A protein has these predicted regions:
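N-terminal membrane-anchoring/stem segments of glycan-assembly enzymes
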Residues: 1-84
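Cell-envelope/extracellular polymer assembly enzymes that use nucleotide-activated donors
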Residues: 88-91, 117, 268
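Short, acidic, metal-binding catalytic loop of nucleotide-sugar glycosyltransferases
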Residues: 106-115
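A conserved acidic beta->alpha catalytic loop
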Residues: 114, 122-132, 148-151
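Long helical/loop segments within the catalytic core of UDP-sugar-dependent glycosyltransferases
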Residues: 135-138, 145-170, 182-263, 296, ...
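Catalytic donor-sugar/metal-binding loop of nucleotide-sugar-dependent glycosyltransferases
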Residues: 261, 270-288
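Active-site donor/metal-binding and catalytic loop motifs
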Residues: 284-299
Length: 303
């Protein structure tokens, strides 16, 4: 069975947007009257009109996403219950660069699955972090992978490790603050075994360990964004890998050619995967934890 999506939401959205533009045409038209030969004013009015039209389209998207989520909130995404008969090899890739979190990784490693390994892909330059990573690896029998440079940053870090590696079937991407549930692997594999065209499975997330006012207030955006936007995108249109808390099949990774060395490598990888015939699915029943940035400066750096 293949996972299928519908473009119905976007057809309705564009149609509603065009109606809004048609109703506003008279107002736009009158704004250009009296411009005369003032070309600078004309150009500014054109730019202003285009910006307004774009923001209306973006606003329509927000309205329709919320509406379709509300409309279908009782229609839970079909969660696979297929049994896994074989024992595919899964590797956890913990990516870190001067932000190692031993507690998060230790919790993520407590998987109710036998055939998996954990690798720390360490791009750290800070000696204290390197020392901490080495101590954790020794205590927990985890392999640490380092490289001479930081070409490609996170994407390059993952590609450097997976280049030429064949002894695995799936890999899971973990950020430094990521905590995945104990049944992450077993639940994720059911999606791949149920839908043959899935190449990427993006898990659900909540914000946890909020220790200050900034985190408690703004983390609500995380808790509302994941179930609303991702469940809608799962059924309508295009869903992207969001960089962490996700499982990727080896076949998808190999056929796509790895992660591109760009800023939004997760989005670009998802597009390349779609072009190769793979799709990205959302797993609402696999709930991972992430930490919200501690302040505005950390938030700005994060985005």
């Amino acid at each position: 069975m293949k996972l299928k999506t519908s473009a119905k939401l976007y057809v309705y959205m564009i149609f509603a947007w065009l109606i809004l533009l048609a109703l506003s045409f008279k107002d736009f038209y009158y704004s250009f009257r009296g411009v005369g030969n003032n070309y600078i004013l004309f150009i500014l009015l054109v730019m202003n009109t285009l910006f307004i039209c774009y923001f209306w389209l973006n606003g329509m998207k927000e309205i329709f996403y919320v509406f379709f989520y509300w409309k279908n909130k009782n229609k839970i995404i079909k969660i696979p219950r297929k049994k896994i008969t074989d024992n595919p090899k899964v590797i956890l890739l913990y990516c870190t660069c001067n932000d190692f979190n031993a507690d998060s990784l230790a919790k993520s490693m407590k998987q109710k699955y036998s055939n998996f390994e954990t690798y720390i892909l360490d791009d750290s330059k800070d000696k204290e972090y390197i020392k901490t990573v080495n101590a954790f690896a020794k205590e927990n029998n985890v392999k640490v992978i380092r490289r001479k440079d930081r070409i490609g940053f996170k994407a390059g870090n993952i590609n450097h490790f997976l280049k030429g590696k064949e002894d695995y079937d799936y890999f899971v991407i973990l950020d430094s603050d990521e905590v995945i549930p104990k049944d992450f692997i077993t639940k994720a594999l059911k999606y791949f075994y149920s839908y043959k065209n899935i190449g990427i499975l993006q898990a659900n997330h909540i914000s946890s360990r909020n220790i200050n006012f900034f985190m408690k207030v703004f983390s609500r955006g995380v808790d509302s964004h994941w179930p609303t936007y991702q469940s809608v995108k799962h059924n309508y249109g295009f869903l992207s890998l969001l960089g962490h808390g996700a499982m990727v099949s080896k076949n998808c990774y190999k056929d796509t050619g790895g992660f591109p060395h760009v800023v939004a490598e997760d989005l670009c990888f998802s597009i390349e995967a779609r072009m190769k015939g793979y799709t990205t699915a959302f797993a609402p029943n696999i709930i991972c934890e992430e930490e919200y940035p501690v302040d505005y400066l950390a938030f700005k750096k994060d985005i």
